[in-house]
Design a protein with these regions (language model features):
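Short beta-strand and strand-turn-strand segments in soluble, beta-rich domains
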Residues: 117-126
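Extracellular/periplasmic metallocenter environments
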Residues: 23-47, 73, 127-171
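Beta-strand signatures of extracellular beta-sandwich domains
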Residues: 100-104
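Short aromatic-acidic-glycine turn motif
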Residues: 107-118
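Asparagine-centered strand-capping/turn motif at beta-strand->loop junctions
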Residues: 91-93
Length: 171
């Protein structure tokens, strides 16, 4: 009986690992190879996302400062960039709570926020994420290779739902 239960658990894990949710989470820093030295290697060879790719810090075209507050808001809450530009985001947490800036499509951010809500605040590392402690500043370098409207959000449980979302317009 115990063997059957273990087999079912193992097979369930295999199914989840191959599911669309697992693939989406892998793109947002929760999948295999997203932590430690493996993460560094994966970032260098990471596929392009619909909203661009990790930028080269030596080739920054512009720096944009984003402030995050405990009012669950970003300032500015909208930025405009040129297609092809590499942007360094200087992300400052003016509050007493931890915050983060995660760049993605609205669907990705919503899916990731739901995952974090159901699994707890699972800190992760990814090229499109800047975690920032209270009264600290973080950095994120991103190249926007496609035109469109993309987003940044704080996916710490409760923050995204409270409206901690910003818009990136790429032309």
């Amino acid at each position: 009986m115990l063997q059957h239960a273990l087999i079912i658990i193992l097979l369930s894990g295999c199914l989840v690992a191959q599911s669309p949710l697992a693939n989406a989470l892998d793109d947002t820093g929760h999948g295999a190879g997203q932590h430690g030295p493996a993460a560094q290697k994966n970032r260098r060879s990471a596929p392009e996302r619909p909203y661009g790719r990790e930028g080269d810090p030596r080739k920054v075209d512009r720096t944009i400062r984003i402030d995050m507050s405990d009012a669950m808001r970003y300032f500015p809450d909208q930025v405009r960039v040129k297609r092809g530009a590499t942007i360094r985001f200087s992300v400052r947490n003016t509050g007493e709570l931890p915050h983060e800036m995660v760049i993605g499509t609205m669907d990705e951010l919503k899916q990731h926020a739901e995952f974090v809500k159901s699994h707890g605040d699972t800190a992760h590392e990814a090229a499109n994420v800047a975690h920032v402690a209270p009264a600290a500043t973080g950095r994120l370098v991103w190249q926007f290779t496609r035109a469109g409207e993309f987003y940044y959000g704080c996916l710490i449980p409760g923050h995204f739902d409270a409206g901690m979302i910003g818009t990136i317009v790429v032309r």
